[in-house]
Amino acid sequence: MYLTPGITAQEYADRRAKLAQSLPDNGVAVLAAAELKYRSGAVFYPYRQESNFLYLTGFNEPDSMAVIRRTGDKLGDYVFHLFVRPKDPKAEQWSGPWSGLQAAQDVFNADETGDINKIESLLPPLLRSASKIYTDVELSRAGQPTKFANMVRSVNRSLSSAPLQPIMNNLRVIKSKAEIANMRLAGQISGRCITAAMRRPWDTEKDLQAFLDYTFTANGCEGPAYVPVVAGGSRANMIHYVHNNAALDPAQLVLVDAGGEYGTYIADITRTWPVSGKFSAAQRDLYEAVLRVQRTGVALCRESAGMTLDGIHRVTENTLRDQLRDLGFDMGRAGALDELFPHHVGHYIGLDVHDCPGYGRHVALKAGHCVTIEPGVYVPDDERFPAHFRGMGIRIEDSVCVDDDSPLVLTTEAVKEVVDIEALRG
């Protein structure tokens, strides 16, 4: 049975078992669901579950808490408690149905469940014999202990705690076959939508964003994975430009950083193309320089290469420096490369766009790691740089799954060769 698209109840149980195995004897992990966030007044944002909570439970509702306790030495020796809202027909008439306590056991396979409204009396007994608590639940706010911190202190003031995130990073960073399949589908849909956008002329950044948001959803994604960058002309030199409200100039390039989400897994793609559909000579020269660098980085996303993301970044810097020098850039000037390429070449991806926060880029890439490779060049409009490249911003990004001997590009449907981009409009 699938609890979320592509991910079975058994896979969620296996994840909990691996977490428990990572804890010391009688260690306890405590996770809180994300809160519903409000835009203004009573107007709320679409709900997004906290990623570690979702990874371990598949439960996509607020006002919930999960407790996982190691009970023995064998894989699978753990107890899973899931505290949720009880069914409430009157409240559900307003908000829509929620799962309730029985479903927490019958559907989400909790060993024990309870009313989240009674958590202050239900949680402390579970912590009394714990050897250590692993949690990222907030312990203080505005200098004062939170309700959760007081619950822990009521059990044992000397009970030690540690962050859960480092353990979760080690579990989440290597993707399962099911996770990779979800990311491949997200990449396939997103890539096709971006290619479809390249086929059409656009007058404004806003219209282009609206097209992508719609087509991601209409073609099977849950929606956009993040607020996209749609940056025409020199606005592409602002790495995270998301105003997306300016007119597009047919003589310039447009940079689009966008992707859809499928089964809560994301695609992360950047493409840059001429608004007119045809590259000028200068646009083509700079674009192809970045593309050569990007291809080099993607080719290193294999376990047999023995590379890290930091290592690929160094290769990218060296290759890009040579490419830009050949185009007439003064790369001997101190700080020139850092100004033209100010960000890292890649990051981990998965449930989050920047997945597994804190997991090092110095770690050797292994089969199952999923990363982005995204070199870019952002040329300021000033006399230190060749006149025909000034104001151009170009980035090319793919989502890539590391395999043993070759990379699996998850976003290959988004075309990136000059000949393919220009052929889209005949």
Enumerate the language-model features and the residues they cover.
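Active-site neighborhoods and metal-handling regions in enzymes and metal-associated proteins
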Residues: M1-G426
